[in-house]
């Protein structure tokens, strides 16, 4: 099974960060939620889950693992339609990616134990709502 990583990154000058009209930080010009700066250690992965040479790594500039990354194209080339997903910012990146995968008719499983948010408390997500 191929292992695919995505990591959210932005340019150092922030020129590729989107400020939404509903974002309270629009007035200041500083986004409230930022990605890691491309090329810095923060944009990498912890040693425990670091990519191996045979794994695939894609940079992403939006919440989805698919938008503008090449992940969908790789899955087609590998003739894969099943996904197992885990990741950070569960209520943003994981949920967005799962919804897009569903729209692309990909069979998707989210491993709850492999998902995390930015706070010590569990982040309510679609997977925990009833």
What are these regions (language model features)?
Residues 5-15, 19-21:
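Catalytic-core segment of enzymes that process non-peptidic bonds
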Residues 16-18, 22-130:
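Active-site-adjacent betaalpha module
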